[in-house]
Swiss-Prot record:
Gene Ontology terms: biological process: tetrahydrofolate interconversion
Enzyme Commission number: 6.3.4.3
Gene that encodes it: fhs
Pathway(s) of this molecule: One-carbon metabolism; tetrahydrofolate interconversion
Protein name, entry field: Formate--tetrahydrofolate ligase
Species whose genome carries this gene: Lactobacillus delbrueckii subsp. bulgaricus (strain ATCC BAA-365 / Lb-18)
Family: Belongs to the formate--tetrahydrofolate ligase family.
UniProt catalytic activity: (6S)-5,6,7,8-tetrahydrofolate + formate + ATP = (6R)-10-formyltetrahydrofolate + ADP + phosphate
Entry GO MF terms: ATP binding; formate-tetrahydrofolate ligase activity
Protein keywords: ATP-binding, Ligase, Nucleotide-binding, One-carbon metabolism
Enzyme class: ligase
Pfam families: FTHFS
């Protein structure tokens, strides 16, 4: 019987976290342990690492458009990282985002890799971990409570209850909280107003946590968060209300990177978790920079496909790092590409070369998108048991015909041994890397130009269309002097368009911009397209129905 991911993880022989840290030159005095197998790295160690003058090679991992068939991007990131570390003997760190409990209990289930390429302790990482998500949720909701109390207690600045833009947050998928009314009943219950909840990982405070370099930076960014507008339509920021210190205090521990290990004991930083469809989609700047200072190779996974997390990493996140990536990996699977053509999971286990050829257009778009930044690219095929030799040969030849190196990876079943060839190739590319990055837009471009450049170059749209609401918001942002900020486009992860049903590699379409939201503390503008939601709902059969715990406390069902 094939073991499940959680069974494999629970059978693993973990090293004490102090032994894992020692591989990076960290001592027990550099750690704040959370039990035996996980720890936060303290500020003393972070500051010391910043002064060591060393920067390792940076490898970005992205993928094709996600499908119900699965791509295994985390599995590939971990498997290749393990192979560089253990098969090639080169000091390596893996940098991943923390899973959100919403999708863990919703559609996705666990998110810590798979098979014999996982980060552990898997149950902790997927559930409460070191408490970062709880700290963020507390900070988000305390901020909202303080704002509502400010209005109730006199509202000296004249903050308009109808123009509050910050939302409350929960790390739970709950569609009933997308639109609510608070303060109902008597005045004793506060000022009645419409409100909304969003998933914790999509909130601006999550973005701020992942972009802050230290506590001072964290506090300054929180102070810049836009709360809402006055009755005279003047902006009000957190610093105007004096709440930044309290909120920063709630997040001061969460800001420190979390250290864990893979099944093969490769050090891994799992820290921060902004979604790539509604936020910037990459792990924290602090953990990536720390990894670069402490190792020779760092693999960082960007959320969803190259059009979302990949694009946001290359156009925005990498400008905040101490270096640009040296190479990139694009992950693909045979069955996911067949899904791009068939739009159904019914027959994906059956050989179908015609569907694979048709679906290849999606991978072709993604790998060329990444190459358009001038970055060296390796395409890896995550092999599944149902893949036939004919399908694998066809896909590999299609990739290589486009001038991309390609390796087939079996890390899910074989661990690092199944990723050795890919590890050798990506190390070769990273070591030889010497290029000038060509980003999608210039930082000096205005918002409309940035949006148009991403839409046309990365999505291959023909045009961009704005609602009247979005046009008004553009005018307001320009009036506020915020029209030159980077853009984070909120878009469905399933398509290059804003329509979830348009699979493959569509062209000639119009991208529909519904609204623009200032994330002043994070330093970008979120551009909402299509029907993207920042508070997901649960599916008819949520993953929660498969999760259980026995009388000994052993958890099952997290894949």
């Amino acid at each position: 019987m094939v073991k499940s991911d959680i069974e494999i993880a629970q059978a693993a022989e973990e090293l004490p976290i102090t032994d894992v840290a020692a591989k990076l030159g960290l001592t027990s005095q550099d750690l704040e342990p959370y039990g035996y197998d996980k720890a936060k790295v303290n500020w003393q160690a972070i500051k010391r690492s910043e002064e060591n003058g060393h920067l390792g090679k940076m490898i970005l991992v992205t993928s094709i458009s996600p499908t119900p068939a699965g791509e295994g991007k985390s599995t590939m990131t971990i498997g290749i990282g393990d192979a560089i570390n253990n098969q090639l003997g080169k000091k390596t760190v893996i940098a991943l985002r923390e899973p959100s409990m919403g999708p863990v209990f919703g559609m996705k289930g666990g998110a810590a890799g798979g098979g014999y390429a996982q980060v552990i302790p898997m149950e902790d990482i997927n559930l409460h971990f070191t408490g970062d998500m709880h700290a963020l949720t507390s900070a988000i909701d305390n901020l909202s409570a303080l704002v509502d109390n400010y209005i109730y207690q006199g509202n000296e600045l004249g903050l308009d209850p109808e123009k509050i833009v910050i939302k409350r947050g929960l790390d739970v998928n709950d569609r009933t909280l997308r639109k609510v009314t608070i303060g109902q009943g008597s005045k004793f219950n506060g000022v009645e107003r419409p409100a909304s909840f969003q998933l914790t990982v999509g909130h601006e405070l999550m973005a701020i946590l992942c972009l802050s370099k230290d506590i001072a930076d964290l506090k300054e960014r929180i102070g810049k968060v836009l709360v809402g507008y006055t009755y005279e339509d003047e902006p009000v920021f957190v610093k105007d209300l004096g709440f930044q210190g309290a909120i920063a205090a709630l997040l001061s521990t969460a800001l420190k990177p979390n250290l864990v290990q893979t099944l093969e004991h490769t050090p891994a930083f799992v820290h921060g978790g902004p979604f790539a469809n509604i936020a910037h989609g990459n792990n924290s700047i602090l953990s990536t920079n720390l990894a670069l200072h402490l190792s020779d190779y760092v693999l960082s996974e960007a959320g969803f496909g190259s059009d979302l997390g990949g694009q946001k990493f290359l156009d925005f996140v990498s400008t905040k790092l101490e270096k640009k990536p040296d190479a990139a990996v694009v992950v693909a699977t045979v069955r996911a590409l067949k899904y791009q053509a068939e739009k159904s999971t019914d027959h994906l286990k059956e050989e179908n070369l015609d569907s694979l050829k048709e679906g290849f257009a999606n991978l072709d778009r993604h790998m060329n998108n990444v190459r358009s930044y001038n970055i060296p690219v390796l395409v890896v095929i995550n092999k599944f048991p149902t893949d036939t030799e004919a399908e694998l040969d066809l896909l590999k030849s299609l990739i290589e015909e486009q001038g991309f190196p390609c390796e087939i990876v079996t890390a899910h079943d074989e661990g690092s041994k199944g990723a050795k060839a890919a590890a050798e190739k990506i190390v070769e590319l990273a070591d030889k890397s010497d290029y000038e990055i060509k980003r999608s837009y210039d930082l000096d471009d205005d918002l409309e130009t940035k949006i148009e450049k991403v839409a046309k170059r990365i999505y291959h749209a023909a045009d961009v269309e704005y609602t009247d609401k979005a046009k008004d918001q553009l005018v307001k942002l320009k009036k506020m002097g915020k029209d030159k900020l980077p853009v984070i486009i909120a878009k469905t992860q399933y398509s290059f368009t804003d329509n979830v049903k348009e699979l493959g590699a569509p062209t000639g379409f119009t991208l529909h911009v519904k609204g623009l939201s200032l994330r002043n503390g994070a330093g970008f503008v979120v551009v909402s397209t299509g029907h993207i939601l920042d508070m997901p709902g649960l599916p008819k059969h949520p993953a929660a129905l498969d999760i259980d715990v026995d009388e000994t406390g052993k958890i099952s069902g997290l894949f």
